[in-house]
Structures are given as C-alpha cells and as structure tokens.
A protein has these predicted regions:
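Glycine-rich, small/acidic residue-mixed loop/short-helix segments
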Residues: 24, 30, 34-38, 42-43, ...
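A translation/RNA-centric and nucleic-acid-associated enzymatic feature enriched
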Residues: 48
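Short, conserved secondary-structure segments in the cores of folded domains
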Residues: 61-62
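Structural motif
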Residues: 69-70
Length: 137
C-alpha cells in the first residue's frame, strides 16, 4: 500500500473447479484478444508490421533493425494511420461486412465469434455501433 492505494486479499472457500487445460478454441480466442496473430504460410509477405499491430506489440524503437522499420517509424513519429488492427468479439449471428478485412481465422465459441481484423479508422464508429458487435479491442 501507499498514500493513494491499498491492496488487500481475502481467501475463502469456493465451489469453483478449475482445470489445468483449456480448449484449443479458448486458447485461440485468448491469443486474439491479446492481439497475438499467428500467421499461416499463405499469409507470408501479405502484411506489413504496422498492419498487424507489431509497431505496438512487438517492436522496440530503442534498439535493433527489422524489416519495414522505416515505414513503422515514419507512421509512429509523423503519420496518421488510416487503418486499425483490432480484435472483434461479436455475436454468432454477426455477418462480417465488406468494411472489415479479416486476418487469420474466425474462432467460434458457444454464442460468440472472435477474430482479428483490419478496418479503416473512419469506419470504426460505424462498425462499433452494430448491435451484433459485443466489443472491439
């Protein structure tokens, strides 16, 4: 604790039973929500690092060189990105619109679908207001 915050822990009995494993679909969905994109061989050379959020998740601007560094650095310091890489969680009935470019596979869970996508920033509010979209991360 400090002057602003205090943390306490309470331990109590629970009937919750946990498992040491999760389903493959839950593992895929968790990775998508974290912004981790697994590319397949056919996706090689399909995306630039900035298109799949590597400029925010996987790149250090303080060290090293990497492919596409100049483009990513230019966008970070000078540009305006007109597209956004995001994770969309939607109801199972949601039909993907033409404004959305799906990256990777759609993960279908019980009553929702989770997928990564690239969308135009100008379309973000329009897509977010769709009643079948649960959240955009």
């Amino acid at each position: 604790s400090n002057d602003d915050f205090k943390v306490s822990i309470s331990i109590k009995e629970s009937d919750y039973e946990h498992s040491d494993s999760i389903t493959y679909e839950n593992w895929q969905a968790a990775n998508k929500i974290l912004g981790i994109l697994f590319l397949h061989f056919e996706d090689t050379f399909k995306y630039r690092p900035i298109e799949i959020n590597y400029d925010n998740l996987r790149v250090s601007f303080d060290k090293g060189c990497y492919r596409g560094q100049e483009i990513v650095a230019r966008m970070k310091y000078l540009g305006v990105d007109r597209r956004k890489f995001c994770t969309i969680v939607a109801q199972q009935e949601y039909t993907v619109s033409n404004d959305i470019k799906i990256t990777g596979e759609i993960v279908n869970l019980d009553n929702i679908k989770v997928f990564n996508a690239i969308i135009k920033t100008a379309e973000l509010d329009h897509i977010r207001n769709d009643p079948k979209i649960i959240t955009i991360i």
